[in-house]
């Protein structure tokens, strides 16, 4: 599936977002649970794509980017754990990441 907009995309999701082999994109800012502490489990695996023309802000408890990708002009990523095995996180400008527990970047 695909969720796309030419404007800002802001989503507040309580528990789980599955974007396996899907696309979430914005020509402007992309904000996923960008306010406060998040318990979100974000699954962007299996060729999932998150694309932001400007800034992407992602606050999540668990982020699975196994064989997935994030492309953004700048990225603020906050998570307890990140699985980026075989995945790609590509940022043109500033990357700010806070990983509280585990980061797997094997073949990433």
Mark where each language-model region is.
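Extracellular beta-strand scaffolds
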Residues: 1-4, 9-11, 15-19, 23-25, ...
């Amino acid at each position: 599936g695909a969720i796309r907009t030419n404007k800002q995309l802001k989503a507040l999701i309580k528990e789980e977002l599955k974007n396996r082999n899907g696309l979430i994109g914005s020509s402007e800012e992309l904000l996923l649970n960008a306010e406060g502490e998040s318990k979100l489990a974000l699954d962007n695996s299996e060729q999932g794509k998150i694309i932001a023309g400007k800034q992407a802000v992602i606050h999540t408890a668990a982020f699975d980017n196994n064989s997935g990708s994030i492309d953004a002009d700048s990225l603020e990523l906050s998570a307890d754990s990140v699985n980026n095995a075989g995945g790609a996180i590509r940022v043109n400008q500033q990357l700010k990441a806070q990983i509280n527990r585990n980061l797997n970047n094997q073949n990433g």
